[in-house]
């Protein structure tokens, strides 16, 4: 029986906790906020469960760390391990949304090639395997309705504060990184 190689990396930030896992080929799972039980145990360190390519996992962690402190990384080159063709198209389109900006689910559906599939685009965001790498917090409802986050569609759910915190973090770092007028 062959072992499956998985690296799990966790970090605590202003928006909550973030964790990523993958097999050395592609990122398979990521979580943020309450969905990251390892964050409490590791307090920002990492736990390796059998890894084929620790360097790649450490590089992704370093990139996420840099993003959390203001780097404008769009993560478009990070391969994702799951998802239908439409979900993958939505996730890649989401990665094209500039830091500090938002787009609607309708925009996302159109950018993914299915302009009439706003609800399906919302479901793709709900199934996002890697929050931050695929910045689903940048996708909002029409009229800037904030919507759910990290699979929690409730308007009063605990992850909604994380979505707001990530948007505020990006707004602050966008203000700091933009040239003075």
What are these regions (language model features)?
Residues 116-131:
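Regulatory, non-catalytic segments
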Residues 84, 101, 114, 123, ...:
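Gly/Ser/Thr-rich helix-start
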Residues 142-181:
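…primarily DNA-binding HTH/wHTH and HhH modules…
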Residues 1-115, 169-181:
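Basic nucleic-acid-binding alpha-helical/helix-turn surface characteristic of O6-alkylguanine DNA
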Residues 132-139:
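Short Lys/Arg-enriched helix C-cap and helix-to-coil transition segments
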